[in-house]
């Protein structure tokens, strides 16, 4: 589960991390409160969406102007102008689709005198089963680009779960970030604070980009991105309450109610598959033949007729879907159950796009018979390659 920057900063501040004063803005009526609360003379007006690259992003609406989703204001009137330009409009970044994300919230905070920008994140290292700090002197940049172009500028520090962040660990991080003086002293305090927040709140990732050294020599968390382990939310009702459902696709929210693994994408071919590996292979082969998947949808191994029908109807709610590929390998999942669910959903939705079904595994003959005798216009496929070619051909007309 992801949260907004302002929520992440409030959480980190509660653990003792140094963050700037700021005011969340949910409507234009909140802007004056921010102006009255924050002294200036520099304010930063930030779009709050669940996507990175906001500063370099562009708004779709012309009235939002040419600037990105993070803007500096040197007087109170500019604070108001930037807020009016951004709130309610759609921001496109490198991490959004071409349709962008609507900016429903802003965060207005005090500006900072920046001397140096650094990168710091905490994550679970799957290879070592430890929590690890990943740090770099190249802050404020796309860390993936740094990893690709100059991997030697990134250092990973493994943390012993029995000891936590030791003075030796903190010294390694300080050395990697070339910190000295007050900044190094701040680091000795900050790293254990961030680690404690990460562990106690069951975070999946904590990214501070940038972590800045200010001109007075002290550290500050300038931007923060936090995601949580969804499986642990039952232990943290305070964290679960931070969820902003407007940031999620409505189809994804409905899929979650059915315990379906569904992710909306930008293509035109809807996919319903059982098993994450098979789902990814299905999307890959669709791309291989020149089209794009409209979604990732894994119905799981033990889905019943109702769950299958629900998945099908969720896929159909995407207006970009021009065809659907059902690709099922029946192990625990039975092909006849899939067939019954698909038929029920097709009848309820009055399907008007091509449908290709590939079934293999448990009760496959019965499943094929059910589809064949349904009288519906379903295109059968013998294998995955055949299915992909048929749905691509059908979509292209």
Curated annotation (Swiss-Prot):
Q: Where does substrate bind?
A: 274, 331-333
**According to the UniProt entry, what is the EC number of this protein?**
6.2.1.5
Binding positions for Mg(2+)?
209, 223
Summarizing the function annotation, the protein's role is: Succinyl-CoA synthetase functions in the citric acid cycle (TCA), coupling the hydrolysis of succinyl-CoA to the synthesis of either ATP or GTP and thus represents the only step of substrate-level phosphorylation in the TCA. The beta subunit provides nucleotide specificity of the enzyme and binds the substrate succinate, while the binding sites for coenzyme A and phosphate are found in the alpha subunit.
Self-association or partners: how does it assemble? Heterotetramer of two alpha and two beta subunits.
Name of the protein described by the UniProt record? Succinate--CoA ligase [ADP-forming] subunit beta
Q: Where does ATP bind?
A: 46, 53-55, 109, 112, 117
Required co-factor(s) are: Mg(2+)
Domain ATP-grasp positions? 9-254
What pathway does the UniProt record associate with this protein? Carbohydrate metabolism; tricarboxylic acid cycle; succinate from succinyl-CoA (ligase route): step 1/1
């Amino acid at each position: 589960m992801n949260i907004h920057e302002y929520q992440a900063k409030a959480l980190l501040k509660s653990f003792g991390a140094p963050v700037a004063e700021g005011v969340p803005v949910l409507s234009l009526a909140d802007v004056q409160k921010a102006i009255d609360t924050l002294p200036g003379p520099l304010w930063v007006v930030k779009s709050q969406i669940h996507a990175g690259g906001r500063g370099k992003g562009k708004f779709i609406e012309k009235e939002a102007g040419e600037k990105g989703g993070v803007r500096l204001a040197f007087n109170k009137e500019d604070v108001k102008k930037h807020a009016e330009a951004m709130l309610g409009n759609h921001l496109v970044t490198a991490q959004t689709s071409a349709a962008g994300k609507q900016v429903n919230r802003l965060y207005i905070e005090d500006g900072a005198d920046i001397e140096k920008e650094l990168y710091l994140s905490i994550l679970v290292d799957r290879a070592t089963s430890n929590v690890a700090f990943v740090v770099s002197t190249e802050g404020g940049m796309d860390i993936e680009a740094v990893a690709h172009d100059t991997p030697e500028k990134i250092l990973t520090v493994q943390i012993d779960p029995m000891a936590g962040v030791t003075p030796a660990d903190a010294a390694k991080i300080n050395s990697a970030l070339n910190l000295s003086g007050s900044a190094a002293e701040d680091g000795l305090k900050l790293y254990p604070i961030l680690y404690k927040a990460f562990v106690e709140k069951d975070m999946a990732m904590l990214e501070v980009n940038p972590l800045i050294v200010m001109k007075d020599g002290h550290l500050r968390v300038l931007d923060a991105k936090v995601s949580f382990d969804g499986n642990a939310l039952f232990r943290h009702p305070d964290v679960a309450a931070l969820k902003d459902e407007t940031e999620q696709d409505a189809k994804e929210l409905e899929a979650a109610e059915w315990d379906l693994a569904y992710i909306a994408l930008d293509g035109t071919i809807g996919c319903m598959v059982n098993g994450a590996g098979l789902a990814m292979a299905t999307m890959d082969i669709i791309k291989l033949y020149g089209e794009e998947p409209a979604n990732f949808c894994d119905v799981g191994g033990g889905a019943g007729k109702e769950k299958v029908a629900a998945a099908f109807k969720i896929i159909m709610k995407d207006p970009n879907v021009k065809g659907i590929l059902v690709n099922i390998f029946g192990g625990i999942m039975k092909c006849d159950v899939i067939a019954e669910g698909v038929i029920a959903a097709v009848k309820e939705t009055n399907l008007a796009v091509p449908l290709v079904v590939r079934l293999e595994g448990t009760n496959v003959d019965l499943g094929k018979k059910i589809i064949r005798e349904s009288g519906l216009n379903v295109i059968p496929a013998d294998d995955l390659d055949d299915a992909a070619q048929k749905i691509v051909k059908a979509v292209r007309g």
